[in-house]
Amino acid sequence: MRGRAGETTMTAALQELAAHIEMKRPDCVISTEIAHDELTVVATPNSIVGLVAFLKTDATCKFSTLIDITAVDYPERAQRFDVVYHFLSMYQNHRIRIRVPVREDDIVPSIISEHPSANWFEREVFDMFGILFSGHPDLRRILTDYGFRGYPLRKDFPTTGYTEVRYDEEKKRVVYEPVNLVQEYRQFDFMSPWEGAEYILPGDEKTDDKAEAKG
């Protein structure tokens, strides 16, 4: 574990990096934030390719490794989604997170021209959230089936799904059918003091024995 001095050094380095990025690319950056020794840059959708190219080639940054692309759904916001990019600079030993707020009907430029590995990441974001990427050479589902309905990681997607898949012995093939619950769907509230399950943990019996002895 790093001590307070190490955390201060890391925070100072990230503050310098954030200031450098804001100074060099003010047209791309909406805001920056440092929390838990991590730098997050909020950027505009139209500038994402240029910003990623800058982060990759700039001598101070050198974020040459794309770790991941994902998204977060905020149904209550006008800009419903955050497309989130994670990059690593092995040269500077830094990580950076780029957040791009987008509306449900916005189209985000693909960064495949800068990071070919973004191909499958962007396909996964499209498959799970329905976010479109312009300039992608093969934007189709990657995890769900061809005729899958909806986007599973959106907050309004039903936990039961819309269809169920099973093998039909008579037809000798896989068939799709509407979801047919054997019993009514129930929402369990395990945090409720009234409906919560009673878990007996190791050592609880000793407490009960002491209570009986006092009684």
Swiss-Prot record:
Keyword hit for Transmembrane helix: no
Catalysed reactions, semicolon-separated: a quinone + NADH + 5 H(+)(in) = a quinol + NAD(+) + 4 H(+)(out)
Keyword Cell membrane: yes
One Gene Ontology cellular component annotation held by this UniProt entry: plasma membrane
Keywords: Cell inner membrane, Cell membrane, Membrane, NAD, Quinone, Translocase, Transport, Ubiquinone
Bilayer topology annotation: Peripheral membrane protein
Subcellular location: Cell inner membrane
GO molecular function: NADH dehydrogenase (ubiquinone) activity; NADH:ubiquinone reductase (non-electrogenic) activity; quinone binding
EC number(s) given by UniProt: 7.1.1.-
Protein name per its UniProtKB record: NADH-quinone oxidoreductase subunit C
